[in-house]
Protein backbone atom coordinates (compact mmCIF):
# COMPACT_ATOMS: atom_id res chain seq x y z
CA UNK A 1 0.00 0.00 0.00
CA UNK A 2 2.63 2.46 -1.08
CA UNK A 3 1.71 6.10 -0.64
CA UNK A 4 -0.79 5.74 2.18
CA UNK A 5 -1.20 4.16 5.59
CA UNK A 6 -4.14 1.83 6.21
CA UNK A 7 -4.03 2.65 9.91
CA UNK A 8 -3.93 6.40 9.31
CA UNK A 9 -7.04 5.95 7.16
CA UNK A 10 -8.75 3.87 9.86
CA UNK A 11 -8.05 6.40 12.63
CA UNK A 12 -9.14 9.26 10.38
CA UNK A 13 -12.40 7.46 9.59
CA UNK A 14 -13.08 6.58 13.23
CA UNK A 15 -12.45 10.16 14.30
CA UNK A 16 -14.99 11.49 11.82
CA UNK A 17 -17.54 8.88 12.91
CA UNK A 18 -17.03 9.70 16.60
CA UNK A 19 -17.69 13.36 15.80
CA UNK A 20 -21.09 12.32 14.42
CA UNK A 21 -22.03 10.14 17.39
CA UNK A 22 -25.51 11.62 17.84
CA UNK A 23 -26.45 10.80 14.26
CA UNK A 24 -24.76 7.40 14.59
CA UNK A 25 -26.95 6.53 17.57
CA UNK A 26 -30.06 7.45 15.58
CA UNK A 27 -29.02 5.10 12.77
CA UNK A 28 -28.25 2.26 15.19
CA UNK A 29 -31.57 2.66 17.00
CA UNK A 30 -33.38 2.41 13.66
CA UNK A 31 -31.38 -0.70 12.81
CA UNK A 32 -32.14 -2.31 16.18
CA UNK A 33 -35.85 -1.55 15.87
CA UNK A 34 -36.12 -3.02 12.39
CA UNK A 35 -34.02 -6.07 13.33
CA UNK A 36 -36.21 -6.79 16.36
CA UNK A 37 -39.34 -6.37 14.26
CA UNK A 38 -38.04 -8.83 11.66
CA UNK A 39 -36.53 -11.51 13.89
CA UNK A 40 -37.64 -11.06 17.48
CA UNK A 41 -36.25 -9.50 20.63
CA UNK A 42 -33.67 -12.16 21.57
CA UNK A 43 -30.22 -11.34 20.15
CA UNK A 44 -29.08 -14.92 20.77
CA UNK A 45 -31.58 -16.20 18.22
CA UNK A 46 -31.62 -13.12 15.98
CA UNK A 47 -28.20 -12.65 14.30
CA UNK A 48 -29.18 -9.35 12.75
CA UNK A 49 -30.19 -7.96 16.13
CA UNK A 50 -26.93 -9.25 17.60
CA UNK A 51 -24.96 -7.29 15.01
CA UNK A 52 -26.95 -4.14 15.74
CA UNK A 53 -26.54 -4.68 19.50
CA UNK A 54 -22.78 -4.99 19.05
CA UNK A 55 -22.73 -1.74 17.08
CA UNK A 56 -24.59 -0.04 19.92
CA UNK A 57 -22.09 -1.37 22.44
CA UNK A 58 -19.15 -0.17 20.37
CA UNK A 59 -20.78 3.26 20.08
CA UNK A 60 -21.20 3.45 23.88
CA UNK A 61 -24.97 3.67 23.60
CA UNK A 62 -26.79 3.37 26.96
CA UNK A 63 -28.46 0.00 27.48
CA UNK A 64 -31.80 1.68 28.20
CA UNK A 65 -31.79 3.15 24.69
CA UNK A 66 -31.07 -0.27 23.21
CA UNK A 67 -33.82 -1.97 25.21
CA UNK A 68 -36.40 0.66 24.25
CA UNK A 69 -35.54 0.23 20.57
CA UNK A 70 -35.90 -3.55 20.87
CA UNK A 71 -39.24 -3.23 22.64
CA UNK A 72 -40.55 -0.85 19.96
CA UNK A 73 -39.52 -3.23 17.21
CA UNK A 74 -40.70 -6.45 18.84
CA UNK A 75 -43.97 -4.78 19.84
CA UNK A 76 -44.72 -3.76 16.28
CA UNK A 77 -44.37 -0.01 16.75
CA UNK A 78 -42.08 1.90 14.40
CA UNK A 79 -39.99 0.14 11.83
CA UNK A 80 -43.07 -1.39 10.16
CA UNK A 81 -42.74 0.74 7.05
CA UNK A 82 -38.96 0.80 6.78
CA UNK A 83 -37.24 -1.06 3.99
CA UNK A 84 -33.60 -1.49 3.09
CA UNK A 85 -32.44 0.02 -0.19
CA UNK A 86 -28.98 0.01 -1.75
CA UNK A 87 -27.71 2.63 -4.18
CA UNK A 88 -24.49 2.47 -6.17
CA UNK A 89 -22.54 5.28 -7.73
CA UNK A 90 -19.26 6.90 -8.61
CA UNK A 91 -17.19 9.48 -6.80
CA UNK A 92 -14.15 11.52 -7.76
CA UNK A 93 -12.00 9.85 -10.40
CA UNK A 94 -14.57 7.11 -10.92
CA UNK A 95 -14.21 5.82 -7.35
CA UNK A 96 -16.82 3.19 -6.45
CA UNK A 97 -19.41 4.00 -3.78
CA UNK A 98 -22.15 1.88 -2.20
CA UNK A 99 -24.84 3.57 -0.10
CA UNK A 100 -27.02 1.39 2.13
CA UNK A 101 -30.22 3.06 3.30
CA UNK A 102 -33.19 2.33 5.52
CA UNK A 103 -36.21 4.32 4.45
CA UNK A 104 -39.96 4.69 4.67
CA UNK A 105 -40.03 6.72 1.45
CA UNK A 106 -37.93 5.54 -1.50
CA UNK A 107 -38.76 8.59 -3.59
CA UNK A 108 -37.38 10.95 -0.96
CA UNK A 109 -34.31 8.85 -0.33
CA UNK A 110 -33.22 8.37 -3.93
CA UNK A 111 -33.67 12.10 -4.57
CA UNK A 112 -31.47 12.97 -1.59
CA UNK A 113 -28.80 10.44 -2.53
CA UNK A 114 -28.77 11.57 -6.16
CA UNK A 115 -28.48 15.21 -5.08
CA UNK A 116 -25.56 14.45 -2.73
CA UNK A 117 -23.70 12.69 -5.53
CA UNK A 118 -24.38 15.41 -8.11
CA UNK A 119 -23.57 18.33 -5.80
CA UNK A 120 -20.20 16.83 -4.83
CA UNK A 121 -18.78 15.73 -8.17
CA UNK A 122 -20.14 12.19 -8.32
CA UNK A 123 -23.06 10.51 -9.99
CA UNK A 124 -25.62 7.89 -9.07
CA UNK A 125 -25.23 4.68 -11.05
CA UNK A 126 -27.45 1.76 -11.96
CA UNK A 127 -28.05 -1.28 -9.77
CA UNK A 128 -25.04 -3.56 -10.10
CA UNK A 129 -22.75 -0.87 -11.48
CA UNK A 130 -20.15 -1.18 -8.71
CA UNK A 131 -21.38 -3.90 -6.32
CA UNK A 132 -19.30 -6.52 -8.14
CA UNK A 133 -16.20 -4.64 -6.94
CA UNK A 134 -17.02 -5.43 -3.30
CA UNK A 135 -17.30 -8.58 -1.18
CA UNK A 136 -19.88 -9.01 1.59
CA UNK A 137 -17.92 -10.30 4.58
CA UNK A 138 -17.05 -9.96 8.23
CA UNK A 139 -13.87 -7.99 8.88
CA UNK A 140 -11.65 -7.61 11.94
CA UNK A 141 -8.66 -5.24 11.87
CA UNK A 142 -6.02 -5.53 14.57
CA UNK A 143 -3.54 -2.69 14.95
CA UNK A 144 0.22 -3.11 14.50
CA UNK A 145 1.72 -4.67 17.61
CA UNK A 146 -1.01 -7.27 18.04
CA UNK A 147 0.12 -10.88 18.45
CA UNK A 148 -0.05 -12.38 14.97
CA UNK A 149 0.22 -15.94 16.24
CA UNK A 150 -2.56 -15.50 18.80
CA UNK A 151 -4.89 -13.71 16.39
CA UNK A 152 -4.31 -16.32 13.71
CA UNK A 153 -4.87 -19.24 16.08
CA UNK A 154 -8.14 -17.87 17.43
CA UNK A 155 -9.34 -16.77 13.99
CA UNK A 156 -8.75 -20.05 12.23
CA UNK A 157 -10.18 -22.10 15.11
CA UNK A 158 -13.35 -19.97 14.97
CA UNK A 159 -13.84 -20.38 11.22
CA UNK A 160 -12.13 -17.38 9.60
CA UNK A 161 -11.66 -17.50 5.83
CA UNK A 162 -8.40 -15.57 5.72
CA UNK A 163 -5.83 -13.87 7.94
CA UNK A 164 -3.61 -11.24 6.31
CA UNK A 165 -0.68 -9.36 7.83
CA UNK A 166 0.32 -6.13 6.10
CA UNK A 167 3.67 -4.36 5.84
CA UNK A 168 2.86 -2.16 8.84
CA UNK A 169 2.23 -5.15 11.11
CA UNK A 170 -1.53 -4.80 11.11
CA UNK A 171 -3.65 -7.94 10.90
CA UNK A 172 -6.86 -8.33 8.92
CA UNK A 173 -9.21 -11.25 9.52
CA UNK A 174 -11.93 -12.02 6.98
CA UNK A 175 -14.90 -14.33 7.56
CA UNK A 176 -18.31 -15.16 6.13
CA UNK A 177 -21.02 -12.80 7.46
CA UNK A 178 -22.74 -15.71 9.23
CA UNK A 179 -19.53 -16.50 11.13
CA UNK A 180 -18.93 -12.94 12.34
CA UNK A 181 -20.69 -13.29 15.74
CA UNK A 182 -18.74 -16.46 16.59
CA UNK A 183 -15.42 -14.85 15.70
CA UNK A 184 -16.20 -11.74 17.70
CA UNK A 185 -17.03 -13.86 20.74
CA UNK A 186 -13.88 -15.93 20.26
CA UNK A 187 -11.67 -12.84 20.10
CA UNK A 188 -13.33 -11.35 23.18
CA UNK A 189 -12.85 -14.61 25.11
CA UNK A 190 -9.16 -14.57 24.16
CA UNK A 191 -8.72 -10.97 25.27
CA UNK A 192 -8.14 -9.73 21.72
CA UNK A 193 -9.69 -6.38 20.79
CA UNK A 194 -9.94 -5.43 17.14
CA UNK A 195 -9.46 -1.80 16.18
CA UNK A 196 -12.38 -2.18 13.78
CA UNK A 197 -14.83 -5.05 13.36
CA UNK A 198 -18.04 -5.21 11.36
CA UNK A 199 -19.92 -6.95 8.59
CA UNK A 200 -19.10 -4.82 5.57
CA UNK A 201 -18.91 -4.53 1.82
CA UNK A 202 -15.14 -4.84 1.36
CA UNK A 203 -13.57 -3.32 -1.74
CA UNK A 204 -11.63 -5.91 -3.73
CA UNK A 205 -9.27 -3.26 -5.13
CA UNK A 206 -8.41 0.24 -3.94
CA UNK A 207 -8.20 3.68 -5.52
CA UNK A 208 -5.87 6.20 -3.88
CA UNK A 209 -6.77 9.88 -3.95
CA UNK A 210 -4.56 12.80 -2.96
CA UNK A 211 -4.74 16.58 -2.79
CA UNK A 212 -7.89 18.30 -4.05
CA UNK A 213 -9.37 15.03 -5.28
CA UNK A 214 -9.14 13.56 -1.78
CA UNK A 215 -10.77 16.65 -0.26
CA UNK A 216 -13.62 16.53 -2.79
CA UNK A 217 -14.15 12.81 -2.22
CA UNK A 218 -14.28 13.28 1.54
CA UNK A 219 -16.94 15.97 1.08
CA UNK A 220 -18.99 13.55 -1.00
CA UNK A 221 -18.72 10.83 1.63
CA UNK A 222 -19.62 13.29 4.38
CA UNK A 223 -22.67 14.46 2.41
CA UNK A 224 -23.89 10.90 1.90
CA UNK A 225 -23.24 9.86 5.51
CA UNK A 226 -25.07 12.96 6.71
CA UNK A 227 -28.36 11.94 5.08
CA UNK A 228 -30.94 10.75 7.61
CA UNK A 229 -31.88 7.63 5.63
CA UNK A 230 -28.30 6.46 5.05
CA UNK A 231 -27.07 3.65 7.29
CA UNK A 232 -23.67 2.82 5.75
CA UNK A 233 -21.42 4.14 3.00
CA UNK A 234 -18.70 1.98 1.46
CA UNK A 235 -16.01 3.03 -1.00
CA UNK A 236 -12.86 1.66 -2.58
CA UNK A 237 -11.01 4.91 -1.91
CA UNK A 238 -8.03 5.24 0.40
CA UNK A 239 -6.69 8.67 1.22
CA UNK A 240 -3.10 9.82 1.17
CA UNK A 241 -1.64 9.83 4.69
CA UNK A 242 -1.30 13.59 4.63
CA UNK A 243 -5.05 14.15 4.16
From Swiss-Prot:
Q: Please give the Pfam families that the UniProt record associates with this protein.
A: TACO1_YebC_N, Transcrip_reg
* InterPro entries named in the record: Integrase-like_N (IPR017856), TACO1_YebC-like_2nd/3rd_dom (IPR048300), TACO1_YebC_N (IPR049083), Transcrip_reg_TACO1-like (IPR002876), Transcrip_reg_TACO1-like_dom3 (IPR026564), YebC-like (IPR029072)
**Gene3D superfamilies annotated for this entry?**
1.10.10.200, 3.30.70.980
Which residues are in coiled coils?
A: none
User: Which residue stretches belong to region Disordered?
Assistant: 1-21
Annotated compartments: Cytoplasm
Give the GO biological process terms: regulation of DNA-templated transcription
Molecular function GO terms recorded: DNA binding
Family annotation (NCBIfam families): PRK00110.1 (NF001030), PRK12378.1 (NF009044), YebC/PmpR family DNA-binding transcriptional regulator (TIGR01033)
Entry's HAMAP family?
Transcrip_reg_TACO1
Protein name per UniProt: Probable transcriptional regulatory protein BAV2207
